[in-house]
A protein has these predicted regions:
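C-terminal regulatory/interaction regions
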Residues: 104-132
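Metallo-beta-lactamase
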Residues: 6-8, 13-99, 105-107, 111, ...
């Protein structure tokens, strides 16, 4: 998939965004879902990890700058449902338990996306401070 490509599966159209940094080819994606007659935007940052930002692990020169540019690009996306690369990114397990207990859909949270992206920026700043 390339930046801006859209893949349609049934009634769902997934938009892909090239977000290099973690690796050169990192892709993030966005699509809409409906629940109770309401439409929500789902988003996933395909390369949130900063482990490749240490100089000994650089995937490519300029990866730190590319990562920050990707985070800035992703901040412009409106996301109601954030899907993490790993379950700890968005407390998948805890939110699933809430659903099983009949609570409101904890996955719908339009604030977690921005908070997670800010967390990604801080993690990179920590890496740069440790490994300038």
């Amino acid at each position: 998939m390339d930046d801006g490509d859209i893949l349609t599966l049934g009634n769902t159209s997934i938009r892909f965004v090239h977000t290099p940094g973690h690796t050169k080819g990192t892709i993030s994606f966005f699509y809409d879902v409906k629940e109770n007659e309401k439409t929500y935007r789902v988003g996933m940052f395909g390369g949130a990890g900063v482990n490749t930002m240490f100089k000994t692990a650089f995937d490519f020169d300029g990866c730190r700058e590319a990562y920050l540019a990707s985070v800035e690009l992703l901040k412009k996306e409106k996301v109601d449902v954030f899907i993490g690369n790993h379950t700890w990114n968005n407390d998948t397990y805890g939110k699933s338990l809430k659903l099983l207990n009949g609570e409101n859909n904890a996955f719908i949270d339009d604030k977690i996306w921005g908070a997670f992206l800010e967390h990604c920026e801080k993690r990179l700043a920590d890496v740069i401070a440790e490994d300038p």
